[in-house]
Amino acid sequence: MVDISMADVRLLRERLGVGVMDSRNALIEAGGDIERAVEILRLKGLKSAEKREGRSVSEGLVVSRQFATHAVLAELCCETDFVAKSDRFLALSERVADLVSDADSLETALRVRCDEGSVADLIALEAAVLGENVALRRFARVEGSRFSVYMHRTSSDLPPQVGVILAYEGHDDATARFIAQHIAFAAPEYLSVGDIPQGILQRERDLLTEISRGEGKPEEVLPQIVEGRLVKLYKQNVLLEQDYVRDNKVTISKVLEATGLRVISFARFRVGT
């Protein structure tokens, strides 16, 4: 049998975060070759990660990076809040955020190259060490030159679970910050009514028409009734139409008009939703 030194075992543990026996067995299988042992453990980690892929990931955190011309928001998920607040998971999220900072989609983010192969490989290997399914669930890139980034903790002992990036034009940074906070709490899906996909809008219009007809409303006034009821949909889902959370007597569009701000775009993630 190959003589395995504790120094090599310790080195392998430090590199991959695996247990003593796993490190020792990998070194034995690799004939004492540390790099080969690393590959053996990585392969085992990827295989064990595949077995966990179907398990629900409803915990985790959001992390962001901001640059001169763009900002990115990522949601890294795991199975339990215990892992979500662990130092290793937090370190993983920071490394992933750095690696994917130039990506333009979730698919390209997962393919970004790193020492472990790709970001997807890195996450799978760390999942093996953490013993949970871990996934980069969502990724958004927001273009612009001025940003307000707001990260919200839903619990003081957990990392941020709600994240918002707001790209805007104007100079009222304080109001931009308040609007980013508004987005975090009001959860709009669209910036303007024009951003709602026509298919979704038409389905909602058809549904409201049938509801109104079932209530016995006259056919000739159904279009007006439906359009009136669509206002509720807009209030729930469209940022510019929402009542401002700091003053519900005015809408976000009125706040922007009064302060000279213009929202270019935004991204919002809440872990597990």
UniProtKB/Swiss-Prot annotation:
Keyword Protein biosynthesis among record annotations: yes
Gene Ontology molecular-function annotations: translation elongation factor activity
PROSITE patterns per UniProt: EF_TS_2 (PS01127)
Region spans: Involved in Mg(2+) ion dislocation from EF-Tu: 80-83
InterPro entries: EF-Ts_dimer_sf (IPR036402), Transl_elong_EFTs/EF1B (IPR001816), Transl_elong_EFTs/EF1B_dimer (IPR014039), Transl_elong_Ts_CS (IPR018101), UBA-like_sf (IPR009060)
Entry GO terms, CC: cytoplasm
Keywords, ordered alphabetically: Cytoplasm, Elongation factor, Protein biosynthesis
Main location: cytoplasm
Cell compartments where the protein resides: Cytoplasm
A Pfam family the protein falls into: EF_TS
SUPFAM superfamilies xrefs: Elongation factor Ts (EF-Ts), dimerisation domain (SSF54713), UBA-like (SSF46934)
Taxonomic superkingdom: Bacteria
Role summary: Associates with the EF-Tu.GDP complex and induces the exchange of GDP to GTP. It remains bound to the aminoacyl-tRNA.EF-Tu.GTP complex up to the GTP hydrolysis stage on the ribosome.
Recorded family membership: Belongs to the EF-Ts family.
Record protein name field: Elongation factor Ts
Provenance organism: Tropheryma whipplei (strain TW08/27) (Whipple's bacillus)
Source organism phylogeny: Bacteria, Bacillati, Actinomycetota, Actinomycetes, Micrococcales
